[in-house]
């Protein structure tokens, strides 16, 4: 195993908080979610991975310690070419998460980056980053080959991709070491 991977920070995934997902598809009860947040804080796991598509209940993040930060995913459409629309969507997104700080904003689906609207949308997000709505822009991918197009064209700081005992595509492709 590549020991550099072990140096990365742990992030708390939240998709099962509102949806049935993964190898053990169960939705977690609110009482259990509170226990998970408490344990995460105790163990200094202060980053939560989430997405606008995960939130169906607004009370999950209510009263959560403001020291938690988010890595959150969005699915922009062509409407995001409007800076004011982008800003409004991000503000609404932040409100849904009880005004927690967004550390990293990820494209949940990168298809828009391959279109003529991609550069304009990315530029709008760069403007919002400068306004301190979030600290970094990244992508969430399943197809490692997308990196060949996206990385040279956009200033991506974070790539979220599958990695586990059975799926080491990011390592085998050479992208992890770049």
How would you label these PLM feature ranges?
Residues 12, 40, 48, 70, ...:
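Conserved, mostly hydrophobic/aromatic
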Residues 17-31, 74-85, 111-114:
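Active-site mouth loops of central-metabolism enzymes
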Residues 1-69:
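N-terminal binding-site loop/beta-alpha segment at the start of enzyme catalytic domains
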Residues 49-59, 77-84, 112-116, 166-171:
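Acidic-and-aromatic substrate-binding clefts and catalytic sites of carbohydrate-active enzymes
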Residues 109-178:
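Beta/alpha (TIM)-barrel catalytic core signal, keyed to glycine-rich beta->alpha loops juxtaposed to Asp/Glu
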Residues 95-117:
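Active-site groove signature of glycoside hydrolases
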Residues 25-40, 81-98, 141-150:
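Short, acidic/polar
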Residues 15-17, 51-53, 73-77, 107-110, ...:
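Active-site beta-loop-alpha junctions enriched in small/polar residues
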